[in-house]
Amino acid sequence: MDFSSFVASQLNAGTIWPEGIIIITLMVILIGDLIVGRSSKTWLPYVAIAGLLAAVVALYFEWDNPNTLSFLGAFNGDNLSIVFRAIVALSTTVTILMSVRYVEQSGTSLAEFIAIMLTATLGGMFLSGANELVMIFISLEMLSISSYLMTGYMKRDSRSNEAALKYLLIGASSSAIFLYGVSLLYGLSGGETTLDAIAAKITNVNGGQSLGLAIALVFVIAGIAFKISAVPFHQWTPDVYEGSPTPVVAFLSVGSKAAGFALAIRLLVTAFALVSEQWHFIFTALAILSMVLGNVVALAQTSMKRMLAYSSIGQAGFVMIGLTANSDAGYSSMIFYLLIYLFMNLGAFICIILFALRTGTDQISEYSGLYQKDPLLTLGLSICLLSLGGIPPLAGFFGKIYLFWAGWQSGLYGLVLLGLVTSVISIYYYIRVVKMMVVKEPQDMSESVKNYPEIRWNLPGMRPLQVGLVLSVIATSLAGILSNPLFNLATDSVTSTPILQSAVISTQISQADK
């Protein structure tokens, strides 16, 4: 084997060709905007969507790739990463559909907004498969810094500027905390950077039992908990969600959160296998706090965006049940729930954007009587909210059933019962909005609904919103009825990933010893 063949085999760059497609798309958008100018806004969004969908198709052809490691082990393109990378790419696709009209109306550059969003997407996709400390941190910062820029993109809006500053300050602090935990891992392993090598070296040093490893675990979990909005690292979420542009909030609630969970699985299962019981205990506590606080505080909210912020905190708590179960069923149900959460949550945000574009408000009380003026929007928002609440036969019901069943099988009886109780609480504040929209008496309509403008889908940027809404509602409805194919996909991604199988077997052995 000559030198060039050896280098090519070690780099294995074909593993990241989905990301390569997005990089090319990003360059086309930047160059097209420079050459054509602001008139490019008529076609650039569709170029971005085409590139993202091409990347998803490329991910499909990467499935069951026998040679998953690339760049000297820095990136792992296994089936687990493929699913999470697809979730990030699809969330960006729907977010761009909902952004066109919103950004145009704000008077800011659409091309720059899409370019920043594609950069965040690249960060999230690389983070989903990162298998080395430097790769993890660079991907995390790529996602985070792009998110800060998008949060403050509406420069004329003081709330957007405030949200960006809060997000930047708290996000920078969490990155520093995470980096400190990662640096401890680097030192404990004797200078190793790939996760597999770190796990092997730590095992050989005092059997892996050291105060340094425990401290590293705490700092790393703090950084991850910030990214997934887990209590008590959630303080930024309500203010940032309320003040940020709504399409950005939609991306943060799905794409960024999915990348955070992908990081949690790969880093904790591989590098912290020796302290598995400890990090499972910590995530159990985080799940309890997130489910209780997220769903209880959401009851008192008057803003739709703020209500969905606390809802997303509660939803993160539900997903953590699958993580703490540490079984094939647990990881599969976790991935399945994130797949359906993608459509039901983004569908809800599309409805919020449509209502805000027509009325200029996101106050829950202003939705009163909406059914009489806009039945399509009422139907779409009702389906998405009821699915988030777990009402059968919508997708959210089956997602929660799978999560709770996986937790019950793993002996997490208290956690599952608490999940059921908080899920019932969440149904109340979702149904409250639905009930408000379908009031029949004209005198009960809000002022915003009484002055509701004529529905015109032929305005610039409205067709993409309509397409996004229809796709999200159909996916939310059908994913519940046809949940088996999606769950089989999630199961295949888990059973074909060696690190998860090793973790599950280790748990079974330790339980048998007890």
UniProtKB/Swiss-Prot annotation:
Q: How does it sit in the membrane?
A: Multi-pass membrane protein
UniProt key word NADP: yes
- Provide one Gene Ontology cellular component: plasma membrane-derived thylakoid membrane
**Predominant subcellular localization, coarse grouping:** membrane
What InterPro entries has UniProt attached to this entry?
Answer: NADH-Q_OxRdtase_suN/2, ND/Mrp_TM, Ndh2_N
| Transmembrane segment boundaries | 16-36, 43-63, 80-100, 110-130, 133-153, 168-188, 211-231, 245-265, 279-299, 307-327, 335-355, 379-399, 411-431, 467-487
Q: Which Pfam families does the entry mention?
A: Ndh2_N (PF19530), Proton_antipo_M (PF00361)
The catalysed reaction is: a plastoquinone + NADH + (n+1) H(+)(in) = a plastoquinol + NAD(+) + n H(+)(out); a plastoquinone + NADPH + (n+1) H(+)(in) = a plastoquinol + NADP(+) + n H(+)(out)
Enzyme class (EC, first level):
translocase
User: Keyword set for this entry?
Assistant: Membrane, NAD, NADP, Plastoquinone, Quinone, Thylakoid, Translocase, Transmembrane, Transmembrane helix, Transport
GO MF annotations for this entry? NADH dehydrogenase (ubiquinone) activity; quinone binding
Q: Name one GO biological process term.
A: ATP synthesis coupled electron transport
Q: What is its EC number?
A: 7.1.1.-
Cell location? Cellular thylakoid membrane
Keyword Transcription part of the UniProt annotation: no
Q: How does it assemble?
A: NDH-1 can be composed of about 15 different subunits; different subcomplexes with different compositions have been identified which probably have different functions.
Entry's PANTHER family?
Answer: NADH DEHYDROGENASE
Family named by the database record:
Belongs to the complex I subunit 2 family.
According to its UniProt entry, what is the function of this protein? NDH-1 shuttles electrons from an unknown electron donor, via FMN and iron-sulfur (Fe-S) centers, to quinones in the respiratory and/or the photosynthetic chain. The immediate electron acceptor for the enzyme in this species is believed to be plastoquinone. Couples the redox reaction to proton translocation, and thus conserves the redox energy in a proton gradient. Cyanobacterial NDH-1 also plays a role in inorganic carbon-concentration.
What name does the UniProt record give this protein? NAD(P)H-quinone oxidoreductase subunit 2
Q: Which organism is it from?
A: Gloeothece citriformis (strain PCC 7424)
Gene that specifies this protein: ndhB
